[in-house]
Amino acid sequence: MRTGIIAQKIGMTSVFNDKGERISLTLVKVDDCQVVGHKTLEKHGYNALVIGIKDKKISRVTKPMKQVFANAKISPKTKLKEFRISEENFIDIAASLEVDYFTAGQFVDITATTIGKGFAGSMKRHNFRGLEASHGVSISHRSHGSTGQRQDPGKVFKGKKMAGHMGCNQVTIQNLKIFAVDKERKLIMIQGSIPGHKNSYLSVKDAIKKISITV
């Protein structure tokens, strides 16, 4: 199992393939992605790599983290993330991970944070149909209706779908195909949409449920 990398979402575009079909693409940028540290089975109980991306001002780094970056002999990074790996896939500390770490035609899993929607009603948050438009319904047309049962159990069960905060959740989209890799501009072009707003950070890993192919 290889390590993943951290990338930054740039935006979306579209291209036409040889058959004239329009393909939607999400562009992600891999800039200054380096190995910051190791986690070993003997010391930490599991094997992992700590990956960092995008240089950060030294004045905005805490003293403990300054020492971490000093030990790795690299400049401070804006975003850090651990990736579990198998024992034979360790990479040297301070090694750089470029866009050619992945290849066109390969399938990947993307983990990102969805865009926050604030406090949302049940119709927007859970796709409820709402109540009747007439026939005695007043004011509560977009309400979710009853949330409980009777005296027994006498409570609302945990996990009941109701209005509440929507978005800002970490989600993983599996089996997205890499359309192309642009090494000069440090871009990975991925087919389909990816969660998160522009300039947000995400992780790109080899797909675990699909065999990758190259075209």
Curated annotation (Swiss-Prot):
The modification N5-methylglutamine is found at residue 151. PROSITE patterns: RIBOSOMAL_L3. Gene3D superfamilies: 3.30.160.810, Translation factors. Keywords: Methylation, Ribonucleoprotein, Ribosomal protein, RNA-binding, rRNA-binding. GO terms for cellular component: ribonucleoprotein complex; ribosome. Residues 136-155 are annotated as: Disordered. Methylated by PrmB. It comes from the Bacteria. One of its GO terms (biological process) is translation. InterPro entries: Ribosomal_uL3 (IPR000597), Ribosomal_uL3_bac/org-type (IPR019927), Ribosomal_uL3_CS (IPR019926), Transl_B-barrel_sf (IPR009000). One of the primary rRNA binding proteins, it binds directly near the 3'-end of the 23S rRNA, where it nucleates assembly of the 50S subunit. Belongs to the universal ribosomal protein uL3 family. Part of the 50S ribosomal subunit. Forms a cluster with proteins L14 and L19. This is Large ribosomal subunit protein uL3.
